[in-house]
Regions:
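Membrane-proximal transmembrane or re-entrant/amphipathic helices at the cytosolic face
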Residues: 2-26, 454, 467-517
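Membrane-interface helix-loop junctions in multi-pass transport and translocation proteins
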Residues: 58-66, 143-144, 166-171, 182-215, ...
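Hydrophobic transmembrane helix module of multi-pass membrane transport proteins
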Residues: 4, 8, 13, 113-254, ...
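Signature of the first transmembrane helix
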Residues: 3-17, 28-88, 123, 149, ...
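Transmembrane helical elements of multi-pass membrane transporters/channels
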Residues: 34-51, 205-225, 234-305, 325, ...
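Interhelical loop/hinge segments that connect adjacent transmembrane helices in multipass membrane
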Residues: 11-32, 195-205, 216-259, 298, ...
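Helix-loop junctions and terminal segments of transmembrane helices
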Residues: 84-99, 164-165, 281-323, 376-381
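Membrane-interface junctions at transmembrane-helix termini in multi-pass inner-membrane proteins
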Residues: 152-176, 360-394, 441-446
C-alpha cells in the first residue's frame, strides 16, 4: 500500500502554496504525541495495578470463580457500552458541530441523560432476568448487584470523552489507570477475608471500582465544564441523536465484542475453569491493547477538526503516524509478555500455565489489530455505515471461525487449553483481516494510502526474541524481574535506531506541545 503519508511524501496541504510546509501538522502531531505519552504512562500504571488483581483473583478465588465473574462482566460491559450511545468517540463530533451554537456542557448533558435512562432500564432488566449474566445458574443477590455497574460504566465513558475533547487525557489516566484497577485489586483482597462477601467478592470489587472511576471523572468534568446553563430535555432532538448514534454505538459494541465473544463461546464449549484461564490470558494481553485506547481520546478531536476543513492529507498522515506508534510499542510489549509467557501466567497460579499458548496468540492479535483501530478512528466520521458493516462481518467471521476451531480441537481430542488457544487464533485472524480491509477503505476515501507497517518492527523483534529465549532458561522470578526489561531494552534499542525518524520521536519529546489547547 506504499509508504505512510508524512510531510515529505503527501504533498502540500490543501489551501497552502506548493512548496510551503504546512503550519498545523506539527501542532496536531504534537497534540497526539502529548496525549499518547500521557496515556502511555497510564498504561504503565495499569500494568502495575492489573497484576495484583490477577494475582489475588487467581490465587485466592481460583479459575472457576474467575470464569463466573468473566461471564457476568462480558454482558455488563457490552450493555453499558451500548447505553453510552457511542459517545466515547461521537461526543467529539457533537461538540465540534456545536461550537459557538450551544453551551458545551449542555451538549454533554444530552448524552448523559440518554445514557442514564438506557442504562438504568438495562440494569433493571438484568436484575429481573439474570440468566444471561450467569449461564451456570450459580449466583446470589450480592452477585446481582453487578448490574448497578451498567450506569456507572456508561457515564464514565461520556465524562472522560468530554475531558478528552479538551485534550485532558490525565483524567482518563487517573480514572482508568489508577483509581479503577487499584480499587478492584484492593477490594477483591478485602472481600475475600469477609466470609459473608467472599463468594461475591470479585463482582462487588468491580462494582465499587466502576463508581470510584466515575467519581474521578466527574470531579474533573465539573471543574472544566461546570453545570449546564438553560438546559432542559428535548425529546425530539434526543430521539434524532439516538438514531444518529446507533451505527457508532453498534460499531463500538462490535469492536469491543470481538475481544469478548471468545469468552462467551468458550463458556458454551469449555469448562468454567478453562474460561477462567482464558480470561487471565486475555487480561494480560489486553495490557498492550490499552496503548491503542491511549490515542483514541485525542485522535478523535484532532480528526474532527481536520474534517471541518476537509484536510484529508493531514488525516492520513495522523492515522499512519499514530498507527506506527501503536504497532511499534505493542510489538515490544507483546514480546516482553509473550516470550516468558509461562512465567507470566504462572504468577497468577500454577493452574493458569496451560493458557500460555492462548496468551501468545492474543498478544499477536493485538499487534495486527492496530491498523484497524486507527483506521476506524477516521472511518466512523467519513464512512460510518460501511465501517459498521465491516465490523459486523468481522465479528461474524470470528464467531464462525472460533466455533469451527473449537470443534476441531474436540475432534482430535486435545485437552481444554487447546480450546482457549483456538479461540485466540480465531481472534488474531479476524482482526488481521479487519485491519487490511479498513485500511484499504480509508485510503480510498482520503485519496492517500494508509499503512502503518514498517519492516523495522521485524528487525527489532529478532534480537528481542534471542534475548527472550535466553532468559527462559532462568528461574521464573528471574524471567519476570530481569527478562521482561531485557527484552524491552533489546527491542527498544533497535526500533529507536532503525525505525524511528524525526516525526516518530515527537512522541518522546516532552518539550513539544500542541499549539492550541
Amino acid at each position: 500500500m506504499g509508504l505512510p503519508p508524512t510531510p515529505s511524501n503527501v504533498g502540500p496541504v490543501p489551501g497552502t502554496p506548493a512548496g510551503t510546509p504546512p503550519e498545523e501538522p506539527d501542532g496536531d502531531i504534537a497534540a497526539l504525541a502529548k496525549g499518547g505519552r500521557t496515556n502511555f504512562f497510564g498504561f504503565l500504571l495499569r500494568l502495575a495495578a492489573r497484576l495484583p488483581f490477577l494475582f489475588i483473583a487467581g490465587r485466592l478465588y481460583g479459575a472457576a470463580e474467575l470464569g463466573r465473574f468473566a461471564s457476568a462482566l462480558v454482558v455488563v460491559e457490552l450493555v453499558a457500552l451500548l447505553c453510552s450511545l457511542g459517545e466515547k468517540r461521537g461526543l467529539a463530533q457533537r461538540l465540534a458541530e456545536g461550537e459557538g451554537k450551544k453551551h458545551p456542557t449542555n451538549v454533554v448533558f444530552d448524552g448523559i441523560l440518554l445514557a442514564t435512562l438506557f442504562s438504568c432500564l438495562a440494569a433493571l432488566f438484568f436484575w429481573l432476568v439474570p440468566a444471561p449474566l450467569f449461564p451456570s445458574g450459580e449466583y446470589n443477590w450480592l452477585d446481582l448487584l453487578i448490574v448497578l455497574a451498567i450506569p456507572g460504566y456508561a457515564l464514565t465513558e461520556i465524562v472522560l470523552a468530554a475531558q478528552a475533547y479538551k485534550y485532558d487525557i490525565a483524567t482518563t489516566v487517573r480514572a482508568r489507570a489508577v483509581v479503577e484497577p487499584w480499587t478492584i485489586s484492593i477490594m477483591a483482597g478485602v472481600f475475600y477475608f469477609v466470609p459473608v462477601l467472599q463468594s461475591s467478592g470479585l463482582n462487588l470489587a468491580y462494582l465499587i471500582s466502576i463508581y470510584a472511576g466515575l467519581a474521578t471523572g466527574l470531579w474533573s468534568f465539573l471543574k472544566s465544564y461546570g453545570l449546564p446553563k438553560g438546559w432542559r430535555p428535548r425529546p425530539r432532538a434526543m430521539s434524532r441523536m439516538t438514531v444518529r448514534a446507533l451505527p457508532l454505538a453498534t460499531a463500538d459494541a462490535i469492536e469491543w465484542g470481538t475481544r469478548r465473544i471468545d469468552i462467551f463461546l468458550l463458556g458454551l464449549f469449555a469448562a468454567p475453569a478453562a474460561v477462567g484461564v482464558y480470561y487471565v490470558a486475555q487480561q494480560v494481553a489486553s495490557l498492550p491493547q490499552k496503548l491503542k485506547t491511549s490515542f483514541e481520546p485525542i485522535l478523535g478531536p484532532v480528526i474532527t477538526k481536520n474534517l471541518k476543513t476537509k484536510n484529508y492529507v493531514k488525516i492520513a498522515q495522523q492515522v499512519c503516524q499514530v498507527g506506527f506508534w501503536i504497532t511499534a510499542m505493542q510489538a515490544g510489549i507483546a514480546l516482553a509478555l509473550g516470550v516468558p509467557g509461562e512465567a507470566v501466567m504462572g504468577l497468577v497460579g500454577p493452574n493458569f500455565v496451560g493458557g500460555t499458548g492462548a496468551l501468545a496468540f492474543l498478544l499477536a492479535a493485538e499487534v495486527v489489530a492496530a491498523t484497524a483501530v486507527v483506521s476506524e478512528a477516521a472511518l466512523i466520521y467519513v464512512a460510518r455505515v460501511r465501517n459498521l458493516w465491516i465490523s459486523i462481518a468481522t465479528i461474524a467471521f470470528q464467531a464462525v471461525l472460533t466455533v469451527g476451531l473449537i470443534l476441531l480441537v474436540d475432534e482430535f481430542n486435545y485437552p481444554e487449553p487447546y480450546k482457549a488457544a483456538a479461540a485466540a487464533i480465531a481472534l488474531m485472524i479476524a482482526l488481521g483481516l479487519a485491519s487490511l480491509v479498513k485500511a484499504i477503505l480509508l485510503g480510498r476515501i482520503l485519496g492517500h494510502p494508509v499503512n502503518n507497517w514498517r519492516w523495522a518492527v521485524v528487525w527489532a523483534a529478532a534480537p528481542a526474541v534471542v534475548v527472550g529465549y535466553g532468559v527462559t532458561r532462568l528461574p521464573e522470578w528471574a524471567e519476570l524481574v530481569f527478562g521482561i526489561p531485557a527484552i524491552l531494552l533489546a527491542y527498544g534499542w533497535v526500533i529507536w535506531r532503525k525505525g524511528f525518524g524525526p516525526e516518530d520521536r515527537v512522541l518522546f519529546r516532552r518539550n513539544v506541545a500542541p499549539d492550541a489547547e
